[in-house]
């Protein structure tokens, strides 16, 4: 089924069935076709147009090196990715004018459901946020780890599973104000890399030596 045959609605929420606009003149894929072009996998599912699933897979194949690959650079920085770490800060008191004090209520903290009760202080609320974070970690949902702020009981230090950059807006809900402070930025990269060693070389036509760092992908 093509896009023209399916104007009335979306075939599926899967990325195989979501259209993608390829760059005109692009033949980056095997010097033959553009990123996101339809592949046999989508044809076999009945979709005949450029699509997001194909685009994601194309970009993945461009960037990911096999285990055993060696990468050399001059910075000495590992090709591994680094996850972003934030402080989450909480202030206020859990309130809902339609409920009496002590009533159960669910507060969303950056999308994570936190079970609380009306009348809770920010410090008490943080204890419930810890539970929600533990559940997210156990289910491998967005969060890699967390720990308490060393001095401020209304803050938690949170590290994410991915290595994307996340800028989260401050907002208030049910009397609690929730904000983010980035304390360690993410870094692009992937896999596990070991430093094999450094090599100092004076290249042709260069007066000063250059130090090269060799990293091997091990996982």
UniProtKB/Swiss-Prot annotation:
<dbReference type="InterPro" id="IPR014791">
    <property type="entry name" value="Baseplate_struct_Gp11"/>
</dbReference>
<keyword id="KW-1188">Viral release from host cell</keyword>
<dbReference type="GO" id="GO:0098025">
    <property type="term" value="C:virus tail, baseplate"/>
</dbReference>
<dbReference type="InterPro" id="IPR043180">
    <property type="entry name" value="Baseplate_struct_Gp11_C"/>
</dbReference>
<dbReference type="GO" id="GO:0098003">
    <property type="term" value="P:viral tail assembly"/>
</dbReference>
<dbReference type="Pfam" id="PF08677">
    <property type="entry name" value="GP11"/>
</dbReference>
<comment type="subunit">
    <text>Homotrimer. The gp11 trimer interacts with gp10 trimer and with the short tail fiber (STF) composed of the gp12 trimer. Part of the baseplate macromolecular complex which consists of gp5, gp5.4, gp27 (central spike complex); gp6, gp25, gp53 (inner baseplate); gp7, gp8 (intermediate baseplate); gp9, gp10, gp11, gp12 (peripheral); gp48 and gp54 (proximal region of the tail tube).</text>
</comment>
<keyword id="KW-1226">Viral baseplate protein</keyword>
<keyword id="KW-1245">Viral tail assembly</keyword>
<dbReference type="InterPro" id="IPR036214">
    <property type="entry name" value="Gp11_sf"/>
</dbReference>
<protein>
    <recommendedName>
        <fullName>Baseplate wedge protein gp11</fullName>
    </recommendedName>
</protein>
<dbReference type="InterPro" id="IPR015976">
    <property type="entry name" value="Phage_T4_Gp11_C"/>
</dbReference>
<dbReference type="InterPro" id="IPR015982">
    <property type="entry name" value="Baseplate_struct_Gp11_N_sf"/>
</dbReference>
<keyword id="KW-0946">Virion</keyword>
<comment type="function">
    <text>Baseplate protein that is part of the baseplate wedge and that connects the short tail fibers to the baseplate. Involved in the tail assembly.</text>
</comment>
<keyword id="KW-1227">Viral tail protein</keyword>
């Amino acid at each position: 089924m093509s896009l023209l045959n399916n104007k009335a609605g979306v075939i599926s929420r899967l990325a195989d069935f979501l259209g993608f606009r390829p760059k005109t003149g692009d033949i980056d894929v095997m010097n033959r076709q553009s990123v996101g072009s339809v592949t046999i996998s989508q044809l076999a599912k009945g979709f005949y147009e450029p699509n997001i699933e194909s685009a994601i897979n194309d970009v993945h194949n461009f960037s990911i090196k096999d285990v055993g690959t060696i990468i050399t650079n001059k910075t000495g920085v590992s090709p591994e990715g680094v996850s972003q770490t934030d402080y989450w800060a909480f202030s206020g008191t859990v309130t809902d004018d339609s409920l009496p004090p002590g009533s159960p209520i669910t507060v969303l903290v950056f999308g994570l459901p936190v079970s609380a009760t009306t009348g809770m202080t920010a410090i008490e609320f943080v204890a419930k946020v810890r539970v929600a974070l533990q559940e997210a970690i156990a289910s491998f949902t967005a969060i890699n780890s967390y720990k308490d702020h060393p001095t401020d009981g209304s803050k938690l230090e949170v590290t994410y599973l991915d290595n994307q950059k996340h800028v989260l807006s401050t907002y208030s809900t049910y009397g609690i104000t929730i904000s983010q402070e980035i304390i360690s930025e993410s870094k692009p990269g992937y896999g596990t890399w070991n430093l094999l060693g450094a090599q100092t070389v004076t290249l042709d036509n260069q007066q000063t030596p250059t130090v090269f760092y060799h990293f091997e992908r091990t996982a």
